[in-house]
């Protein structure tokens, strides 16, 4: 399927192997497709957060600099997430995996097929997403706030259950390091 982002075939030893062309004698292929959502921006991408800061925080600072650290104590971020209604993906993850000599595409099948052979990939994948979430969103805004005399507070999405945290940020606790006033959303 030419529209597939990654194509895999079953392999007795490895579980699955990514292929880029049809394989003789193979009739069953497992395809992974890449879909995007207009409802979400890629906050794992540092360029996206830089643009967000430039278009919001920098504008506030340009207009209200004299209030920063006084009347304007800080910024509140509400439920940042990489996307909670589908399996998350960012091209930035591919770059991060390449730094270790791996391809994220080679393991994507393990986000959908549960087998012990895929555990290491799933763990590395979600740890990578969480690190990108913390470094490229929370830390960037936290550092900007600190440099401009104000504080950062807010909360992530789905703090109430560990499994649900995988949907939005892979874990919420690491982000608290980069909030002056960490918060959670408890609605009942």
Where are these regions (language model features)?
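Mature extracytoplasmic enzyme cores
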Residues: 1-123, 128-132
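Generic, well-ordered alpha-helical scaffold segments in large soluble proteins
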Residues: 55-63, 132, 136, 140-144, ...
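Aromatic-lined carbohydrate-recognition surfaces of secreted/lumenal glycan-active proteins
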Residues: 72-80, 125, 129-167
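Substrate-binding cleft/loops of secretory-pathway carbohydrate-active enzymes
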Residues: 80-94, 153-188
């Amino acid at each position: 399927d030419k529209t597939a982002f990654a194509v895999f075939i079953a392999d007795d030893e490895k579980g699955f192997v990514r292929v880029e062309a049809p394989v003789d004698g193979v009739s069953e292929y497992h395809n992974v497709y890449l879909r995007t959502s207009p409802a979400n921006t890629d906050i794992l991408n540092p360029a996206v957060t830089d643009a967000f800061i430039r278009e919001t925080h920098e504008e506030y600072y340009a207009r209200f600099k004299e209030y920063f650290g006084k009347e304007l104590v800080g910024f509140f971020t509400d439920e940042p997430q990489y996307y909670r209604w589908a399996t998350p993906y960012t091209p930035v993850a591919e770059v991060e995996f390449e730094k270790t000599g791996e391809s994220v595409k080679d393991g994507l099948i393990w986000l959908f097929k549960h087998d012990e052979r895929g555990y290491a990939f799933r763990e590395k994948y979600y740890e990578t997403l969480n690190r990108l979430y913390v470094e490229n969103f929370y830390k960037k805004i936290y550092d900007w706030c600190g440099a401009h005399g104000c504080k950062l507070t807010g909360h992530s999405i789905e703090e109430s259950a560990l499994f649900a945290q995988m949907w939005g940020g892979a874990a919420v606790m690491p982000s608290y390091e980069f909030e002056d006033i960490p918060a959670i959303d408890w609605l009942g």
